[in-house]
Amino acid sequence: MIQISDTAKSHFLKLIQREGVPGMGVRLSAVDPGTPRADARLEFADPSELVGDEWLIDCGDFTLYVASASVAWLDGAEIDYVTQATGSQQLIIKAPKIKGQELSQVASLVERVCWVVENEINPQLASHGGRVEVQEVSAEGVVLLRFGGGCHGCGMADVTLKQGVEKTLMERVHGVIAVRDATDHSTGAAPYISRDFSP
């Protein structure tokens, strides 16, 4: 169920009336759902642009159309239009399921490691154009990783591995006892910091 505040409905209605298109509504969809970069998208929806499988939410003077593929990701979402302390107004969408839900402890060790890598570690590495991929997780809890992007060949990869990736995985995933790097860093084409770097 998606909750829309009265102030958000009034805001949407004002925008729709400004467009002056009969039957126009608002379409809500999830962009890149289940990933760290997931976001909610709101846009005007002319009746002729609708696919036909959207879920309809009657908002009184207009309809909110929810893309059918986005329904599960947007379940429990709240849309509000609030006045900030500064006096400015802002549309706020809270969609707690849009980025996916953290796996429970009953998930396998591999699933939990992959979830933390994709949802916590890779978003941080992306700021340097890097990423890491899980190559293997042994039954004993040793994780074998391969760095890519700006991390492939980076002079700080060892520090990133020990102080960032390994520390995070060991704190967040019960059962991980060590993390190893399987990357051949000598083949890195565009490292964030060259391995020849000396401060």
Swiss-Prot record:
<dbReference type="Pfam" id="PF01106">
    <property type="entry name" value="NifU"/>
</dbReference>
<keyword id="KW-0004">4Fe-4S</keyword>
<keyword id="KW-0411">Iron-sulfur</keyword>
<feature type="binding site">
    <location>
        <position position="154"/>
    </location>
    <ligand>
        <name>[4Fe-4S] cluster</name>
    </ligand>
</feature>
<dbReference type="GO" id="GO:0051604">
    <property type="term" value="P:protein maturation"/>
</dbReference>
<keyword id="KW-0479">Metal-binding</keyword>
<dbReference type="GO" id="GO:0051539">
    <property type="term" value="F:4 iron, 4 sulfur cluster binding"/>
</dbReference>
<comment type="similarity">
    <text>Belongs to the NfuA family.</text>
</comment>
<protein>
    <recommendedName>
        <fullName>Fe/S biogenesis protein NfuA</fullName>
    </recommendedName>
</protein>
<dbReference type="InterPro" id="IPR001075">
    <property type="entry name" value="NIF_FeS_clus_asmbl_NifU_C"/>
</dbReference>
<dbReference type="InterPro" id="IPR017726">
    <property type="entry name" value="Fe/S_biogenesis_protein_NfuA"/>
</dbReference>
<dbReference type="InterPro" id="IPR035903">
    <property type="entry name" value="HesB-like_dom_sf"/>
</dbReference>
<feature type="binding site">
    <location>
        <position position="151"/>
    </location>
    <ligand>
        <name>[4Fe-4S] cluster</name>
    </ligand>
</feature>
<dbReference type="InterPro" id="IPR034904">
    <property type="entry name" value="FSCA_dom_sf"/>
</dbReference>
<keyword id="KW-0408">Iron</keyword>
<comment type="subunit">
    <text>Homodimer.</text>
</comment>
<dbReference type="GO" id="GO:0005506">
    <property type="term" value="F:iron ion binding"/>
</dbReference>
<comment type="function">
    <text>Involved in iron-sulfur cluster biogenesis. Binds a 4Fe-4S cluster, can transfer this cluster to apoproteins, and thereby intervenes in the maturation of Fe/S proteins. Could also act as a scaffold/chaperone for damaged Fe/S proteins.</text>
</comment>
<dbReference type="GO" id="GO:0016226">
    <property type="term" value="P:iron-sulfur cluster assembly"/>
</dbReference>
